[in-house]
Amino acid sequence: MDLDQIVADAQQSFEQAADITTLENEKARFLGKSGALTELLKGLGKLDPEARKTEGARINVAKQQVEAALTARRQALADALLNQRLAAEAIDVTLPGRGAGAGSLHPVMRTWERVEQIFRSIGFDVADGPEIETDWYNFTSLNSPENHPARSMQDTFYVEGKDADGRQLLLRTHTSPMQVRYARMNRPPIKVIAPGRTYRVDSDATHSPMFNQVEGLWIDENISFADLKGVYTDFLKKFFERDDILVRFRPSYFPFTEPSAEIDMMFEHGKNAGKWLEISGSGQVHPTVIRNMGLDPERYIGFAFGSGLERLTMLRYGVQDLRLFFENDLRFLRQFA
């Protein structure tokens, strides 16, 4: 058979092969052990040396042309198969995308950070303390000695075991222990707030066994109730972002302050206009507490206040039931995102 005809037949056969299997079968017709080109190569031994050299060169050129056609068809079939697979896996970019769930701060944590930001802006430090506290720091150091009737004002979660000094452990009932802890590590003037979790045996629409509180303390040589009123009123106006806030101090009793006062506030406008809302406890730090801080009560004086972060959050956002903050209902929480 003429070499040119063999090459032409091979190229045509390869081009007509619809799949790899057919192509491999056609390859065997031309390049296999009994293929047309292979038979021609076997016959070279019958030729004289000069003719063998010339004919061998021609057969090799023809073989290269056939192999090139084979390679080209293999690539074409592979490309077609890939395109078919890609078409089956195609993504419709016109479909709306799936939105990723964006997280947000819990409303109480928003309040926590806002309180810190406001008090930092007026020169207060921020401190943190242990939630498992000793009864000495939680009660005794704050002028509530053992068997003092003030200890019955709140039910306490006591913890099994005692500290290294043999003192009873408990879940702190307020953040006030940080008054003494911080003052023992820092010298006056002391301006600090201590936000944190606290625990009491109480649960209803306005109380939770675990709640967040922020303690405020300012100790120096000439601090008065006027400073307390100025600081706290300024805080409320910044926190609620309004100037129509009236503040009053009602006489009260706390063992760690003397005199003591409940702080109430009232909006002049809006749905709560004309209503006095209890917001915080406060007072002038008791001399016994100042003494337990390691300071001289004849020289130093100051004020303290304690505010519930959930209470502030409820008033800011108009939430009526405290328990909603702890149920983790996304329908509720997304309102504050």
Swiss-Prot record:
Gene Ontology terms describing biological process: phenylalanyl-tRNA aminoacylation
Binding site for Mg(2+): 258
Xref: SUPFAM superfamilies: Class II aaRS and biotin synthetases, tRNA-binding arm
Any Pfam family: tRNA-synt_2d
PANTHER family reported for this sequence: PHENYLALANINE--TRNA LIGASE, MITOCHONDRIAL, PHENYLALANYL-TRNA SYNTHETASE
Subunit and partners: Tetramer of two alpha and two beta subunits.
Sequence similarity: Belongs to the class-II aminoacyl-tRNA synthetase family. Phe-tRNA synthetase alpha subunit type 1 subfamily.
Protein name: Phenylalanine--tRNA ligase alpha subunit
Taxonomic lineage from the root: Bacteria, Pseudomonadati, Pseudomonadota, Betaproteobacteria, Burkholderiales
Gene (UniProt): pheS
